[in-house]
Amino acid sequence: MNDTLALLQKFNAHPDSRCWYVAWNPKGTLLASCGGDRTIRIWGREGDSWECKTVLQDGHQRTVRKVAWSPCGNYLASASFDATTCIWKKKNDDFECLTVLEGHENEVKCVAWAPSGNLLATCSRDKSVWIWEVDEENEYECVSVVNSHTQDVKHVVWHPTQELLASCSYDNNVCVYKEEDDDWECRATLEGHTSTVWGLTFDPSGQRLASCSDDCTVKIWKECQPEGGQEGTDAAWKCVCTLSGFHGRTVYDIAWCPLTGALATACGDDGVRVFKEDETADPDQPAFSLSAHVPKAHTQDVNCIAWHPKEAGLLVSCSDNGEIAVWNYQSGV
């Protein structure tokens, strides 16, 4: 390992609470965090450090599990254990709650915007994935409810350029969805993990998907076009690589750097790891090596990892101990 992962700053973001998730706005000027204290905190850079700019605390009655910025950066969505999703509008340095999306029967575990900004996906412990459409008046309408998982759905993520959605679940599977005749349906089920799948990330091209699991592995799935290339036939997703033996406990989150292609993981063994792809390997049989590892990045489980969208190598992680850590990853090659 010639590469380094250096700590730039660590701060107590959600005191006496878990910090569940962190998300950069599209420009990378703001970082949103959420936690068990029912708050969302917005962080901005002041010189070399990150300072809390505002606290959103009136939206939810229970833990806020995930936050997601709209592609334009003017809206923030928050998913909560109170079974609702709040949509916040940025107004100068402040945020106001525009609307509350209701319908899930249990905790909402994740929320994600499509690259167009016109669609939003939510998922829940009620085993369902909901697709919401956003109109010009900022009205949100549920256009599809998909029940393709048999257990709690942990995470949803959109393809970087297409209206293609993936979800993962306590049922050990990953589902890939597309719209068909005005309805969304599961077009592929990716089976291979032997325990809960916690997180998903597309590579910058959208041709590959990485999943992380309670089985302590990371799997890389590649989109394979059907033979003969018939029109209307769905692409299949094939597992082309499994990273095993690197993580000591559950891998809770995974992030593919949009700038460098490095893959970072957040783990229940308190560690943060970065993997690098062997560029000489066959694309159909990719190989990844562990390039940097901080064994005790936090004193408790690491819940989330997020690459900065504009600065290569800048990475944040957050933990059950309420902390956020800011890292600089440098490749030795």
UniProtKB/Swiss-Prot annotation:
Protein family membership: Belongs to the WD repeat CIA1 family.
The protein's assembly and partners: Component of the CIA complex.
PANTHER family: CYTOSOLIC IRON-SULFUR PROTEIN ASSEMBLY PROTEIN CIAO1-RELATED (PTHR19920:SF0), WD40 PROTEIN CIAO1 (PTHR19920)
This protein's name: Probable cytosolic iron-sulfur protein assembly protein ciao1-B
Example GO BP: protein maturation
Annotated WD repeat ranges: 14-53, 59-98, 103-142, 148-187, 192-231, 246-285, 297-333
Gene3D superfamilies for the chain: YVTN repeat-like/Quinoprotein amine dehydrogenase (2.130.10.10)
HAMAP family in UniProt: ciao1 (MF_03037)
Cellular component, GO, one term: cytosolic [4Fe-4S] assembly targeting complex
Record keyword Repeat present: yes
Alphabetical UniProt keywords: Repeat, WD repeat
Annotated Pfam families: Beta-prop_WDR19_1st, WD40
Source domain of life: Eukaryota
Function: Key component of the cytosolic iron-sulfur protein assembly (CIA) complex, a multiprotein complex that mediates the incorporation of iron-sulfur cluster into extramitochondrial Fe/S proteins.
Database matches in InterPro entries: CIAO1/Cia1, WD40/YVTN_repeat-like_dom_sf, WD40_repeat_CS, WD40_repeat_dom_sf, WD40_rpt
